Amino acid sequence: MSGRGKQGGKARAKAKSRSSRAGLQFPVGRVHRLLRKGNYAERVGAGAPVYMAAVLEYLTAEILELAGNAARDNKKTRIIPRHLQLAVRNDEELNKLLGGVTIAQGGVLPNIQAVLLPKKTESHKPGKNK
């Protein structure tokens, strides 16, 4: 035995997910699989699912932040579809992005046309009735 050859080679490094490498919570591997299976293109590059997962994570965080604020404004600790609806419809950009989306159990934004409101009568100013 000359001491050459395999001598307990290096242990394989612990597997690290693509999500953790990119610093994301959303699953990059699952997004990659869905892009491949969805027949969106013949081939899918390595960076595409990372970018897609990052965009989805950002949009989700943005909506949840606004919905959490809406829940807090209504003195609630749980986000319900109504809070999601209020969050999306009160934000100009999200409303444009999700304009054609119906949120189940979301309700509508409170809105009363100005024409339907009672007219204000001019109050008499004191001191000018002489």
Swiss-Prot record:
Which residue positions does N6-lactoyllysine occur at? K10
The positions making up the signal sequence are none
Region described as Disordered: spans on this chain: 1-22
Question: How this protein is processed and modified after translation, per its record?
Answer: Deiminated on Arg-4 in granulocytes upon calcium entry. Monoubiquitination of Lys-120 (H2AK119Ub) by RING1, TRIM37 and RNF2/RING2 complex gives a specific tag for epigenetic transcriptional repression and participates in X chromosome inactivation of female mammals. It is involved in the initiation of both imprinted and random X inactivation. Ubiquitinated H2A is enriched in inactive X chromosome chromatin. Ubiquitination of H2A functions downstream of methylation of 'Lys-27' of histone H3 (H3K27me). H2AK119Ub by RNF2/RING2 can also be induced by ultraviolet and may be involved in DNA repair.
Give residues where N6-succinyllysine occurs: K10, K96
As stated in the Swiss-Prot or TrEMBL entry, residues carrying the post-translational modification Phosphothreonine are: T121
Q: Which residue intervals are annotated with compositional bias (Basic residues) in the record?
A: 7-19
Task: Kindly list any coiled-coil regions of this protein.
Answer: none
Subcellular localization is given as: Nucleus; Chromosome
InterPro entries associated with the record: Histone-fold, Histone_H2A, Histone_H2A/H2B/H3, Histone_H2A_C, Histone_H2A_CS
PTM-bearing positions, type Phosphoserine: S2
Cross-link Glycyl lysine isopeptide (Lys-Gly) (interchain with G-Cter in ubiquitin): which residues? K14, K16, K120
Does the keyword DNA-binding feature in the UniProt annotation? yes
Q: Which residues carry this modification: N6-glutaryllysine?
A: K96, K119, K120
Q: Which GO terms describe its cellular component?
A: nucleosome; nucleus
Q: Which residues carry this modification: N5-methylglutamine?
A: Q105
Alphabetical keyword list: Acetylation, Chromosome, Citrullination, DNA-binding, Hydroxylation, Isopeptide bond, Methylation, Nucleosome core, Nucleus, Phosphoprotein, Ubl conjugation
Which residue positions does Citrulline occur at? R4
- Residues that bear N6-crotonyllysine: K37, K119, K120
Q: What does this protein do?
A: Core component of nucleosome. Nucleosomes wrap and compact DNA into chromatin, limiting DNA accessibility to the cellular machineries which require DNA as a template. Histones thereby play a central role in transcription regulation, DNA repair, DNA replication and chromosomal stability. DNA accessibility is regulated via a complex set of post-translational modifications of histones, also called histone code, and nucleosome remodeling.
Q: Which family does it belong to?
A: Belongs to the histone H2A family.
The entry's protein name is Histone H2A type 2-B
Q: Which organism is it from?
A: Mus musculus (Mouse)
State the encoding gene. Answer: H2ac21
